[in-house]
Amino acid sequence: MRIALGVEYDGARFHGWQRQNEVISVQQHLEEALTRIANEPIRVVCAGRTDAGVHATGQVVHFETTSQRPDRAWTLGINTYLPDTISVRWVKAVPEDFHARFSATARRYRYIIYNNTLRSGILANGVTHIYGDLDHELMHEAAQKLVGKHDFSSFRAVNCQAKTATRTMSHIRVKRMGDYIVIDVQANAFLHHMVRNITGTLVAIGHKEKPVEWVDELLEVKDRTKAGITALPNGLYLVHVTYPETFALPKLKMGPLFLADDF
């Protein structure tokens, strides 16, 4: 049978999602916990592989098993064997045609900036500290130029292995909440470092180092070296993955922290 999981994790202590030799990953911990509960080797497939330091409140995975357990037993059992920084939020049996990656129709990320002169001593791993006043309204205005179907070559990592840089962005919003600025973005799929590179570009605009029209130039030139720096990973969260309603997956609050779904 095929089972889907909703997973939340603090990425600060892991070398990314993907299992790797000699370093600790989220995938490794999850597969080891599942193997113990299922009493058979388990390998998982995720909706989106996150980099080292990147978090998730809405990661989705699936796996195959012959073990028969109620959903609640899976949830409680798996969490027993996971570290405190990883939590399974829901479990659901799914049809064989469900695929965590290929069935997904959209991914949604949120990037949290702590815009204050002094860094935070409490949320250091969960937000990115950027000092110097940021004009979030300029950032939002510039971000709207990214909505729609574009070639995002200027915002992909140099080592990105995607066959095409064309992606369709359904929305991107920039909103200030006191000392915090949140960038909320959704697209059908994302390139490697795409959200972090967009964030670095918007920060330069927010600092008024570049004009709003710079985004138009970057979309036209399709050159990663011309865009902003890659923002740090610690402010980035995968908060939701969208699937067809026919799969009827559970819907939980996206977060992270204090953020409402419709913030």
From Swiss-Prot:
Keyword terms, alphabetized: Isomerase, tRNA processing
Origin: domain of life: Bacteria
Protein function: Formation of pseudouridine at positions 38, 39 and 40 in the anticodon stem and loop of transfer RNAs.
Any GO BP annotation: tRNA pseudouridine synthesis
Keyword Isomerase: yes
Summary of subunit composition and partner proteins: Homodimer.
Active site: 51
Catalytic activity annotation: uridine(38/39/40) in tRNA = pseudouridine(38/39/40) in tRNA
EC number: 5.4.99.12
Binding-site residues for substrate, renumbered to this chain: 109
Protein name per Swiss-Prot or TrEMBL: tRNA pseudouridine synthase A
Keyword tRNA processing listed: yes
GO MF term set: RNA binding; tRNA pseudouridine(38-40) synthase activity
Pfam families to which the protein is assigned, alphabetical: PseudoU_synth_1
Family: Belongs to the tRNA pseudouridine synthase TruA family.
